[in-house]
A protein has these predicted regions:
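The cytoplasmic-loop to transmembrane-helix boundary for the fourth helix
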Residues: 95-128, 134-135, 146-155, 185-202
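Hydrophobic transmembrane alpha-helical segments in integral membrane proteins
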Residues: 1-21, 155-159
Length: 244
């Protein structure tokens, strides 16, 4: 009989395995078949898959190794932001028209400011207090109420960040559709039906991220609700690899 604990552990491991598998396949494909002009796209995707795998490894550490998580939580916070930025840069590059300005690096700098601020704040919070916040699954530490709430709000912030960058990606795709008159004339780069599917899957990841606004972390981790974004991510990875 498949136990609940086994399903939870498998759910955490699934996006790690799928993202690492996709990264390896893209690297191998790049060395044997890819065109030189597609190099940037492949590098972005490999970076995205590696960030996703690292992010879910950090999530696994949060659940099973809380002491280690406290030491790497700044890294996890940065990965949460940057993975979505890299994904958007991939969409931006894929739909970039001749003469259009290159991707702005400000998208990477803004998360550094947020995470840097949190890192400085964390430096003034005792290690034991941070461990308590993690092991209690989101309980407010006495005397550190604001920090506790910010520390445990990452799923919610991740959902908001996802909404913002998925909306930007949709805007890019719609603008691209308006700018070209014949998709078939650019078939090498755009059979964009799959990009639409990719964005739909990405947008479907938003509601699970916002579950933390409804349920406590104790309930989320103890339930199977996290299987939803985990399985959707595996589907997203399959769509990308199949079409690249």
């Amino acid at each position: 009989m498949i136990t609940k604990e086994f399903l939870q552990y498998t759910g955490f491991c699934a996006p790690i395995i799928s993202s690492l598998g996709c990264a390896i396949m893209l690297v191998l494909f790049r060395h044997t078949h890819a065109k030189s002009e597609e190099g940037t796209l492949h590098r972005l995707l490999v970076s995205y898959f590696l960030l996703v795998s690292l992010g879910w490894i950090c999530s696994l550490v949060y659940v099973y190794l809380p002491l280690l998580y406290v030491r790497i939580n700044i890294l996890y916070y940065l990965i949460v932001f940057w993975s979505q930025v890299v994904f958007y840069q991939f969409i931006y590059t894929l739909t970039r028209l001749p003469g259009e300005k290159p991707f702005s690096r400000i998208h990477y700098i803004f998360p550094l400011v947020i995470v840097g601020t949190f890192a400085v704040w964390s430096a003034f919070v005792p290690f034991e207090t941070q461990v308590y916040i993690v092991t209690s699954r989101g309980e407010v530490a006495p005397g550190y109420e604001a920090y506790s709430r910010f520390f445990t709000a990452r799923l919610l912030l991740r959902g908001i960040w996802n909404i913002a960058y998925t909306a930007l990606a949709w805007w890019r795709l719609l603008a691209y559709r308006r700018s070209i008159s014949d998709y078939s004339a650019n078939a090498d780069r755009t059979s964009l039906a799959w990009v639409t599917l990719l964005l739909l899957i990405s947008f479907s990841l938003v509601p699970p991220s916002l579950l933390s606004a409804i349920f406590s972390k104790k309930i989320l981790i103890a339930s199977l609700l996290l299987l939803i974004p985990q399985l959707l991510l595996v589907a997203q990875h399959a769509v990308v690899c199949y079409n690249m």
